[in-house]
C-alpha cells in the first residue's frame, strides 16, 4: 500500500505586479494568482524550491 503524501498549504501574500516573469511563472506553478489565495500541494523538494524562489510573495500556512 502506498504511503500518503505530505500536504503543504501555501498562501500568496504579495502581488506579482512588477515582478520578474520567472517569479510570475513560479506563482502559476504553485497554483496561485491572487493575494490571499491558498493552495494545497504535495510536499516535495521541487515545491519547496519553488516556495524558496518566491518566499517574499508566499507564506506556508500549514504542513501536514
From Swiss-Prot:
It comes from the Bacteria. Keywords: Ribonucleoprotein, Ribosomal protein. SUPFAM superfamilies: Ribosomal protein L30p/L7e. Coiled coil: none annotated. Gene3D superfamilies: Ribosomal protein L30, ferredoxin-like fold domain (3.30.1390.20). One of its GO terms (molecular function) is structural constituent of ribosome. One of its GO terms (cellular component) is cytosolic large ribosomal subunit. InterPro entries: Ribo_uL30_ferredoxin-like_sf, Ribosomal_uL30_bac-type, Ribosomal_uL30_ferredoxin-like. GO terms for biological process: translation. Part of the 50S ribosomal subunit. NCBIfam families: rpmD_bact. Belongs to the universal ribosomal protein uL30 family. This is Large ribosomal subunit protein uL30. It comes from Rhodopseudomonas palustris (strain BisB5). The gene is rpmD.
Amino acid at each position: 500500500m502506498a504511503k500518503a503524501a505530505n500536504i503543504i498549504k501555501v498562501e500568496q501574500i504579495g502581488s506579482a505586479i512588477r515582478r520578474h516573469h520567472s517569479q510570475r511563472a513560479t506563482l502559476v506553478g504553485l497554483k496561485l494568482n491572487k493575494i490571499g489565495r491558498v493552495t494545497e500541494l504535495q510536499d516535495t523538494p521541487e515545491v519547496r524550491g519553488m516556495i524558496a524562489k518566491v518566499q517574499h510573495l508566499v507564506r506556508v500556512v500549514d504542513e501536514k
